[in-house]
Regions:
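Alpha-helical segment of the N-proximal tetratricopeptide repeat
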Residues: 90-114
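Helix-turn-helix repeat elements of alpha-solenoid scaffolds
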Residues: 2-10, 66-72, 100-106, 154
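Duplex nucleic acid-engaging cores and interfaces of nucleic-acid transaction enzymes
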Residues: 13, 26
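Structural signature of alpha-solenoid helical repeat scaffolds
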Residues: 18, 54, 83-84, 115
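Catalytic glycan-binding domains that act on GlcNAc-containing polysaccharides
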Residues: 2-4, 18-25, 37-49, 60-63, ...
Length: 261
């Protein structure tokens, strides 16, 4: 039934032309289906179509199979002095400059969110640089998502912030593993709470925290303690370590991702 599968995946890819992730995944699996039918022209066509979206998982796989060097640019173009002066001459720019000078990061984050409540591409792009410089990861992602909804093309680095937060007792796993879970679970929002009660950056359930944590402070406290970024990351890291040691997961990151959820 590979022929039928190829047709379904092809139609799936074409019907979702505005969703690059589904377009890439549909194209990739169409190519895989045609590979079973030895239809090399079709394989090449659909792999190339998937490769047009290199910032997606299946786009990267397609690039790798085709031997195409990833065109992803991780550099960020800095604004020139003229653009900077234009921004700082705005009332919102003046307020941000004042907050930076007196060192008030929380108020700075609030101001950036407020000034981007109405879309202005120039202001949003400048705000991104400020958010990245001050490691305001959640704010950075909110602006990125808003700009992308309006069709803006941004350097991919903006979509993957690296916050300053660390687990209370330091990293015992690769930091990138925790960054990935924070990105997916809470978009780096330390105050996030799901309808099921999962809390904070790593979306930890209070019951899981009390079960997994060796920290007496967490075992004795109410759920709001999980809004503390360092403690939340500490519990999340302990939970990931626990899962990785299970025989059913055996250090497999794909299985880990499924088990965490």
């Amino acid at each position: 039934r590979y022929k039928e599968a190829a047709e379904f995946f092809s139609n799936f890819s074409i019907s979702l032309k505005d969703n690059v992730w589904h377009q890439a995944s549909g194209s990739f699996w169409a190519a895989r289906s045609y590979a079973k039918l030895n239809k090399y022209e079709e394989i090449n066509f659909w792999l190339n179509r998937a490769a047009k979206n290199p910032d997606s998982f299946y786009g990267l796989l397609a690039c790798n199979i085709l031997g195409i060097e990833s065109p992803i640019d991780w550099e960020i173009n800095k604004f020139n002095s003229s653009e900077k002066n234009n921004f700082l001459s705005l009332p919102s720019g003046m307020r941000i400059q004042a907050l930076v000078q007196v060192g008030l990061p929380l108020q700075l984050e609030d101001e950036i969110i407020y000034m981007n409540s109405v879309l202005n591409v120039d202001i949003a792009e400048w705000s991104l640089q400020i958010a990245q410089h001050f490691n305001l990861a959640h704010t950075q992602l909110k602006i990125v998502n808003k700009l992308q909804q309006y069709g803006a093309t941004l350097p991919i680095k903006y979509s993957y912030p690296t916050p300053l937060w660390k687990p209370k007792n330091g990293f015992k796993l690769q930091p990138e593993i925790l960054y990935a879970f924070m990105h997916q679970e809470s978009m780096f929002n330390k105050n996030a709470k799901s309808y099921r009660g999962a809390m904070g950056l790593m979306q930890v359930m209070p019951s899981t925290a009390k079960f997994i944590s060796k920290n007496k402070e967490i075992k004795r406290s109410n759920e709001n303690i999980l809004k503390n970024p360092e403690l939340n990351l500490e519990v999340g890291q302990e939970y990931i370590e626990y899962l990785l040691k299970l025989d059913s997961i055996n250090n497999n990151l794909i299985f880990l991702t499924a088990a965490y959820n």
